Amino acid sequence: MRQLTLVLAALVCLAGEPAGQSAQPADPVAALLGRIEAALLDSNPDRYMALLSSLADRESAALFAEGMASPGLTRVVIRERDRVELAGTLPGEGYRLLVEVLRETGQRATLNTWRLDVRRRGSDALDWGVVSQELLTTLRGLYRLTLNTRHQFTARDLVVVSEDVKLTVPEATVFTAETENGPTAYVILGRGDMTFSPAPKGERTQLRVISGAEVLQTPFDGTFVRVHPATASSRITAREMVERPVDPRDLKRAEEMFRHEAAKSFGLDLGDLSADSWSLLPLPGDLLAEIRTRRFETLTYTKSSNEVEDVTLFDRRQRRNLSVYSSRDHLARYGRSYHEDEESEYAVRWYDVNVIYNPARRLLQGQTRLAIETTASSANTLKIRLADPLVVESIVSPEFGRLLSVRVRRQNTIVINLPTTVIKGYRLELVVTYSGTLEPQEIDRESVAVSAPQVPEQPTEEEVPLEESYLFSNRSYWYAQALTLGYAPARITVTVPEPWSVIASGEFESVAPPPGPAPRGPRLRQFTFVASQPVRYLAFLVGRFTEPRVETLSLKHIEESLLASRQPGVYYDELTLRVQTNPRQRQRGREVLRTTVNIVRFYTSLVGDFPYSALSVGVVERRLPGGHSPPYLSMVATPGPGSTLRWGDDPAALPNFPDFFAAHELAHQWWGQAVGWKNYHEHWLSEGFAQYFAALWAERSLGRGVFGSIIRSMQQWSVQESDQGPVYLGYRIGHFKGDSRLFRAVIYNKGAMVLHMLRRLVGDEAFFAGIRRYYNTWRFAKAGTDDFRRAVEAESGMDLGRFFERWIYGDTLPQVTFTSRLEQKDGADLAVLRFEQSGEIFDFAVTVTFEYPDNSTTSTVVKVTDRVVEARVPVKGRPRRIDANRDQATVGVFR
């Protein structure tokens, strides 16, 4: 049962109302449960035995009663959660019950799930007994923590330590909350100093960006600390700690801190089982500290061993992470490029999602069927993701029947209790039914959108209200799903009232009235989509869309050499394209379809494949341009008529490229969807690739001049914002500042520039062959930077370890001194080009431009892979000027 304790070591609460609960006095089953409560509270197994049916196995019942009616119980609560007819009995004569049982012993408690078979014992309709009983799950180690008001301590030179953090308090007042094995919570009052010194270089950069220094040092006035009693002595020490009489003023301050801070972590809200606050213990070696600083208000430090990135510093006021990384032990265990599925309990093999959405009320009713296969060595709980506003009505498994669940507060997570432990490879289905009010998703960081101007602008009278549309995608958690985004085929059915239409992940299958009698009110239409290929996540878009423009695109133009390199799998010779627009964008439909056809054909020629059989494009209106690209679906947002907003000062606004958003979003069908990323650090493998492929389309469709201006723009943003952190920080670039432009500058533009510089270093043939090898190897799987590096190394024969170490994992730029001189050799004019790097050595190729007196220019590319590189290049006469990186195709500082 230890696993159940681990997965619930967070703030959780019971999901939903008790199913099947009937507390009316006339209910004989409720009366029987009340008698069982009394028998357990009396710690009297014999009283339980007296409640058995004559058909019961008394030996197994006696063992059960001995375990449940343990000595010292101070409170017992039994709540019925489910009731079905008992096989072999007449209707109303017997039931199989699922019940939850809370057994308290003083300040400790145990939570159990039982299965009880009960039936009427004789002619008396109110006389029922227990036929059989089974203990399904147990959650031990619940504590009703209270501050010890009888003891106060004075400590000198008190120190709290954990990985990379140290809190020191010269003179401290200490109160504790204890378990039977010692204190687990400490309230520490007194002025002290906090030092947080993260080991990873990227985390130190983040601290410098946020606080101005790579080590965070800040005074604080008090802290609340949670530890496991067994390891408390190694985490909290003092030169001297003595008890003193309780000071009412100190106690009042301590109680205020305890009341405010204790409920934030490790807490259970047991709903109708108990109105009290219950807490789990941190795992041995873990630590949580709520630190009341003067500069940041409350900072939360956690060392949580059940997370891959187990060290976190969190700003409660801003609700943003300052630092998140793996401890030294976890780094050695999981590596830098860890897989986010590392600790997953299961993999989803198939989804069937059926929802009804009412745009006017924002009401969503849904049912998700998940076919899953366990991947953990053993499991008696499973966790799923579902938006907090959606109330779970039931979770049923054909294998186990109705299942009990608890919801993790404010984390969009539900923990499901299995009635038995299952081993690796076990297959089962979950059917999750839910409903609630759910707001649509804004365009977010797995999409592209420019930021609003820094000076707020109000809509003018000339602006026309936007055509409404509603997106539910990867951040909406609108369907029950695994905690991490895996790959699985799916079927989606979405029902909406007329005149609304739906575009969704998958190939369009049908639209028809829903089965059954027609409801009163607006007519309903049911849209069905099937994703035969595995997808990372599902999405749907609701709008008043025009009838689709449909075109079938042949994919037979792919070169034979590219077909030969494919891995085994399902591939398509043609693609069905569907374009739908808001009514005001109707005239754009033909243009969007033509552009989409050309872009898809171009990208397919580079990669050698389009991953899906169909693609739907939805053109919608937003105040600012942007887009989002789930599998099988690309949404392009355009400003509405009369929009006066300007967005030129944004990394996503590439110059002279009107098709940018469409090109970027379409590229995500390959990069981000067909090939995913292992964890959030690898986000550049989606956004950087999509950004660079969009630039390649600009080169193909608009020419080298536009491509060059795009490269210069991306280079300038990269140089300007590289000090915000390495590409490998992913979403956290700009996160604390709340400035998404920084994220796009580094992840989108610098990520794209890394690809451009890699292409120039290894050459076009090796670069695009590496792209195809990478795609073919990781099609419908999640990859990391090292996987891409190995693919390009295999095609180029070059060692690219340092290249990626500097450009992806580092946050510095090459500092290059460039000099040139002219000389003659054997009658030929030569330019001697010298590059000297100071600081860290980078690998790159750089353009050297020769400008002659007649204003003509020539150029050459020099590969710089050492601290000092000299190259001799023939020139025609005497150039009047020689420049390095005039085309700004290399990110760096050249002098």
Language model features: what each stretch is:
Residues 5-15:
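Bacterial N-terminal signal peptides
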Residues 529, 556-574, 579-834:
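Hydrophobic alpha-helical and helix-loop surface patches within well-folded domains
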